[in-house]
Amino acid sequence: AIGHSLGGMSILNAIRENLKVKKAVIIGSGDIIQDIIDDFIKKLKLKPEIGIKLRDHFEKKYEVKMNYYSASNAAKEVSIPVLIIHDENDVDVNVKAAHNINENLKNSELMITKNLGHRKILGNTEVIKRIVEFIKE
């Protein structure tokens, strides 16, 4: 399974919930749900209280803490090999997310790129080459 950005978070959560895959690759994945919501709210120039209300609504409706779905939290229950790829200059998702996810995985490899950002990373030849190698290993 391969996922980018929110897709990386989704993959880790799906694996935790018994998605059967042999390996996973996450690229530019976010981590902490509340941080992502706060960032969106800031970009949309909304009041910070909206993020709190959104979290409270989610937790009441689904009867689960939103942080349960954070990538680093899901990673704690993932045992398959995971390749984490992130750019140190990603302005959409800070590279600290990759390090935090990596620290919580049991079987991971971390590839940090330079000057590819959040989107160019997807078409980079070296990134694609490493993904193919990882899948074949």
Locations of regions flagged by a protein language model:
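Gly/Ala-rich beta-loop-alpha elbow adjacent to hydrolase catalytic centers
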Residues: 3-7
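Hydrolase active-site cap/lid region
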Residues: 13-64
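Short alpha-helix in the alpha/beta-hydrolase fold that links the catalytic acid
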Residues: 71, 80, 94-103
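Short beta-strand/loop motif that positions the catalytic acidic residue
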Residues: 77-79, 84-86, 90
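Catalytic histidine neighborhood in serine/cysteine hydrolases
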Residues: 102-119
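Catalytic histidine-centered segment of alpha/beta-hydrolase-like enzymes
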Residues: 116-128
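C-terminal alpha-helix
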Residues: 130-137
